[in-house]
C-alpha cells in the first residue's frame, strides 16, 4: 500500500515533497487477501524483510505531517495515512468482506464492520479460504452485489419491481433531513474493463494469462489473453471507438448494450446472461489446458505466435457469441 506525499512549494513553482511512503506485506502461503480503495495494513513488523518491506521514512513522514506521535512499534499505516470512517468501511471494506465471506468461513462476525457500524471489529488483513480458490470462483467474486447479506442490493426498495442490484449515483442522498446511502458493490455499472491476472507456476513465464472483460462484470464475460500475445484483439483495440464514439465492432459497446438491456428487467434477463457467461468461461478454462499442452511443445518464438493467434481468435469468438446474445 502506498500514498503520495502531496505538494510542498519549493519556491520555484515545483514540488519539494516528491515521492511516496509505502508498506508491502507478503501474504502467507495458503491465505488470500483483498483490497478495495481503503488502506488495510495497520501495524507491521519492522525487522522481517522476507515478509515485510517499507519506505525508510514511512513513520518519520507521518510524524512530520502530524499524523502520528506514538512509538514506532505501534505505528499503523492505515490509521496514520487513511483513517477508517463510515465511507471507508461501507463503500470499500465491505467489498473485501464480500470476497472473504465467499471463500472463507466465519466472516459474518464482521458484518457490523462491513456495514460501517463498528470500526473496532476490523477484519484481518488476510484469511484462510475453506478450499483452494479456483479461477472461476475468483471470476464470480467480481460479480458480487452483496447477495444474501443485509446489504443485498436485489432485495431493498431501490431494486424496484425487477430486483435490479444497481443504484444510480450519488451514493449518498437526503430525504426529509435524513441521510441515506446506496451500496458500492464489487460489480458496478461504471466499469470500463475488468480482469483477473493468472500467474501459473506449472508453465513457462510467457504463458501467464490476463482474463479480460469489458463493461459491468456481473453481465459480461472474461476471455483469456496470454501475456505473450503480440497483438490486441480487434474488438478490444484502443482505436476501435471510444467512450464517446460508438463502434459496432467494439466489445465494450456490445457488452454495454446487453448490460443496459438487462438493467431494465434484471430478474428476467440477468439469469440468461449468466448461463452464457458460465458456459463460456468454463469452456475457456478447459480449452486453455489443451492449449497449454500444445504450446509447451513449441519453441519460444513459435509459442508466442501460437498463443497470440489463440488469444485474438478466442476474443473474436466471444464477440460473435455476445452478438447473438444481443439479438436474443
Model-predicted segments: where are they?
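C-terminus-biased signal that marks the final domain/tail of proteins
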Residues: 2-328
Amino acid at each position: 500500500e502506498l500514498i503520495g506525499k502531496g505538494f510542498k512549494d519549493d519556491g520555484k513553482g515545483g514540488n519539494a515533497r516528491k515521492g511516496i511512503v509505502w508498506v508491502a506485506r507478503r501474504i502467507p502461503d495458503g491465505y488470500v487477501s483483498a483490497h478495495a480503495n481503503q488502506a488495510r495494513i495497520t501495524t507491521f513488523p519492522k525487522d522481517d524483510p522476507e515478509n515485510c518491506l517499507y519506505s525508510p521514512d514511512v513513520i518519520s513522514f507521518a510524524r512530520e505531517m502530524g499524523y502520528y506521535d506514538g512509538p514506532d512499534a505501534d505505528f499503523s499505516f492505515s490509521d496514520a495515512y487513511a483513517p477508517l470512517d463510515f465511507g471507508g468501511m461501507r463503500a470499500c471494506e465491505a467489498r473485501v468482506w464480500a470476497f472473504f465471506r465467499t471463500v472463507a468461513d466465519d466472516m459474518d462476525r464482521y458484518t457490523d464492520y462491513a456495514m460501517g457500524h463498528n470500526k473496532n471489529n476490523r477484519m484481518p488483513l488476510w484469511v484462510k479460504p475453506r478450499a483452494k480458490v479456483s479461477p472461476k470462483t475468483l471470476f464470480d467474486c467480481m460479480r458480487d452485489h452483496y447477495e444474501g447479506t443485509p446489504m443485498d442490493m436485489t432485495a431493498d426498495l431501490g431494486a424496484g419491481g425487477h430486483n435490479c442490484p444497481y443504484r444510480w449515483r450519488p451514493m449518498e442522498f437526503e430525504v426529509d433531513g435524513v441521510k441515506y446511502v446506496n451500496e458500492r458493490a464489487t460489480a458496478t455499472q461504471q466499469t470500463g474493463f475488468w480482469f483477473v491476472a493468472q500467474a501459473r507456476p506449472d508453465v513457462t513465464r510467457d504463458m501467464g494469462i490476463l482474463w479480460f472483460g469489458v463493461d459491468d462484470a456481473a453481465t459480461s464475460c472474461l476471455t483469456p489473453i496470454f501475456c505473450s500475445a503480440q497483438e490486441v484483439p480487434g474488438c478490444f483495440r484502443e482505436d476501435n471507438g471510444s467512450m464517446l464514439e460508438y463502434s459496432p465492432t467494439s466489445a465494450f459497446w456490445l457488452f454495454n448494450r446487453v448490460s443496459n438491456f438487462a438493467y431494465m428487467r434484471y430478474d428476467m434477463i440477468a439469469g440468461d446472461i449468466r448461463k452464457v457467461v458460465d458456459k463460456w468461461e468454463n469452456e475457456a478454462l478447459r480449452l486453455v489446458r489443451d492449449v497449454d499442452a500444445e504450446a509447451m511443445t513449441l519453441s519460444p518464438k513459435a509459442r508466442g505466435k501460437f498463443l497470440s493467434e489463440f488469444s485474438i481468435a478466442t476474443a473474436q469468438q466471444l464477440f460473435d457469441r455476445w452478438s447473438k446474445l444481443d439479438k436474443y
